[in-house]
Amino acid sequence: MRGGFGRFTQQHPIFTIVKGGVGGRNGLVTLSLSNTDPLFPTFPNVLPGFPPGATLPARSIQEISPDLENEHAWQTSFGVQRQIGSRTSVAIDANINRGVKHGFLDMNAPTPIPKDQLNAALASNPNAVIRTQAQADQTRPQLPGPNGFRHMDVLTNEGRSWYQGVRFSVIHRTTPLTVTASYTRSDAEDMLNHWFSPENSRDPKSDRGPTGADTPHNLVTSWSWNVPGSGAVLGGWRVSAVTHSQSGAPYTIRYAGDPVGYGLGVGAACNSRGCQASTPNGRNTARGMFINYADLTMGKQFQVGADRIEFRADVFTVFNNQNLLAGGYINLVGNPRFGQHTGGSAVLPSRQFQFALTYRF
């Protein structure tokens, strides 16, 4: 029987501090100028500084809450293990984790449009615009104007994470053979992230969803066999294998463009960490296919006096089956290829061979 309880913490990630300094109201100003604009610089001249009293369009900023605290998590674990005979043991372990983490919130977010109204309005044309940016700006707490701000993302302590999982494992050992199997059933969710604000900052809880690493089912088996034999040719061989089968990662289904006038358009961030774009059902509601692969290893030791030579051959993804990553699925509602996979770099490597020879002295 075993168990534990503890609080774990970490220091502020430096890039979030840099964001607050560079992307804040007194940080960098990004603007676009046409080549006909009087302020457009001519090589080798550089863009001059803004003159006193210059009027700038409303911009978006990222700042840090003055009461920001370190991220931390409370973790509880409990497990039991039992020996069955002299060669087999079984174990059950449970783990619960509750975390408090950083998360951006847009303190000047427009009034959200309810999901049922959004989906009904876009049912016939998923690429339609049901509210312009100007109309959305009218619903912001602070109206964007000259020298003002549109998005006011503030890094807060409102982020949360939840994890609970149970792992079942068995180990069987004999003189030539060792076999292990482990199955984990788990659930991992989080809310907000320290990269960008969510789809609806006025209701942070609506961002709660599976984490990008959520793996409800995870089965790993392995075996290692010392092949019987003796002599220079038949002795010293070992064959081992590992099989892995797990749930595919989640991903978010979203609408293209900016149907509600949020102001980010096609540049809206949307990945496994979070989603600023408009979604029909929320974050990480779809899931990729199961990931399955098997690796095989064969090795032999040769004794050379007091020294040893080790030969090893590895085959990764023995069955050469295709494993599709969640980031490759086309997730735009209305896209003719919606739900299909793009392949390419979003596919785990196919079968690979590796050979090694080691001399130990």
Give residue spans per PLM region.
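Outer-envelope beta-barrel architecture signal
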Residues: M1, S86-T88, T175-L177, H217-L219, ...
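Solvent-exposed loop/turn elements at secondary-structure boundaries
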Residues: M1-L155, G267-Q276, N281-T285, M289
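Membrane-embedded beta-strand positions of outer-membrane beta-barrel proteins
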Residues: G3, V80, I92, V170, ...
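Residue-level signature of outer-membrane beta-barrel architecture
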Residues: R7, R82, H172-T174, W225-V227, ...
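Extracytoplasmic gating/loop element in the C-terminal half of outer-membrane beta-barrel translocons
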Residues: G49, S230-G305, E310, F316
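Hydrophobic, lipid-facing positions within transmembrane beta-strands of outer-membrane proteins
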Residues: I64, W74-F78, Q164-F168, H217-W223, ...
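Gram-negative outer-membrane beta-barrel transporters
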Residues: N95-A232, R238-Q246
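C-terminal beta-signal and terminal closure region of outer-membrane beta-barrel proteins
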Residues: R287, N323-F361
